[in-house]
Amino acid sequence: MNGEEQYYAATQLYKDPCAFQRGPAPEFSASPPACLYMGRQPPPPPPPHPFPGALGALEQGSPPDISPYEVPPLADDPAVAHLHHHLPAQLALPHPPAGPFPEGAEPGVLEEPNRVQLPFPWMKSTKAHAWKGQWAGGAYAAEPEENKRTRTAYTRAQLLELEKEFLFNKYISRPRRVELAVMLNLTERHIKIWFQNRRMKWKKEEDKKRGGGTAVGGGGVAEPEQDCAVTSGEELLALPPPPPPGGAVPPAAPVAAREGRLPPGLSASPQPSSVAPRRPQEPR
């Protein structure tokens, strides 16, 4: 029976959440700690404090002979306010004042909430993209771009000097490039790019000339062959035939036969060397 009485007594002791805080209040009783052993469930409303005199002693502060340090007034303590006003601890905690800007935020970011933030420089607008101003995302301010390349307009005097230099040297050296840049009031990069473009143009012109010359040369070679193949009969008669290997008929035989100076036994046509010419038969 004694064990059961002790068990029920202990159970009644732990039923009250703040039972361990009760006791005789000393003269310098400090603020009682808040109930921290409760779980995540919301705490029930605490019962009224059985010692109202203790609150008066707490509000007066600790005596100077016990604590040499200054003790802040207990009215600002959340635990004392929790016990004094019988409210939950969550409502008794002071809320931080809501400033105009959150911590770590810049004022310029909140001034323009509709402004589009572009973290990359290549996403910024350029002068060439004028269509961006027509869509809703083009409302952001375009910063001036100093590194944007613009097309260089060369004057006639500059082009004349560059063409002269290119006529003598297709590939310009570094010292000469520096000299031309100073003389023409240009940068080395401008001169280098101009020479690169001029070389490409010159190579295209050379390739075009080579292709046209090959076509013309092929036609010129083929035309004489066609003229020699297509000839008339009169031209063939006018040309002397090649001499035979045996040499029986002189080269002037065709001309003499045409003029009628050959004897009747000889023929104007060439004969092979294996066949001897016929002699005229003598009358019997």
From Swiss-Prot:
Pro residues bias locations: 41-51, 239-253
Pfam families attached to this UniProt entry: Homeodomain
Predominant place of localization: nucleus
Residue segments, region Disordered: 34-75, 202-284
Stored InterPro entries: HD, HD_metazoa, Homeobox_antennapedia, Homeobox_CS, Homeodomain-like_sf
Compartmental location: Nucleus; Cytoplasm, Cytosol
UniProt keyword Transcription present: yes
GO MF, any single term: DNA-binding transcription factor activity, RNA polymerase II-specific
Statement: the UniProt record of this protein carries the keyword Transcription: yes
Signal peptide from the UniProt entry: none
Residues modified as Phosphoserine: S269
Start-end of Gly residues biased regions: 212-221
Region (Transactivation domain): 13-74
Residue ranges of DNA binding: 147-206
Modified residues annotated as Phosphothreonine in this record: T152
Motif Antp-type hexapeptide, residue range(s) on this chain: 119-124
Gene3D superfamilies, alphabetized: Homeodomain-like (1.10.10.60)
GO cellular component: cytosol; nuclear speck; nucleus
Superkingdom as given in the UniProt entry: Eukaryota
Changes after translation: Phosphorylated by the SAPK2 pathway at high intracellular glucose concentration. Phosphorylated by HIPK2 on Ser-269 upon glucose accumulation. This phosphorylation mediates subnuclear localization shifting. Phosphorylation by PASK may lead to translocation into the cytosol.
Gene Ontology process terms (BP): digestive tract development; exocrine pancreas development; glucose homeostasis; glucose metabolic process; insulin secretion; intrinsic apoptotic signaling pathway in response to endoplasmic reticulum stress; liver development; morphogenesis of embryonic epithelium
Family: Belongs to the Antp homeobox family. IPF1/XlHbox-8 subfamily.
Subunit text: Interacts with the basic helix-loop-helix domains of TCF3(E47) and NEUROD1 and with HMG-I(Y). Interacts with SPOP.
Function summary: Activates insulin and somatostatin gene transcription. Key regulator of islet peptide hormone expression but also responsible for the development of the pancreas, most probably by determining maturation and differentiation of common pancreatic precursor cells in the developing gut. Binds the DNA sequence 5'-CC[CT]TAATGGG-3'.
Domain notes: The Antp-type hexapeptide mediates heterodimerization with PBX on a regulatory element of the somatostatin promoter.
Name of the protein described by the UniProt record: Pancreas/duodenum homeobox protein 1
Organism: Gorilla gorilla gorilla
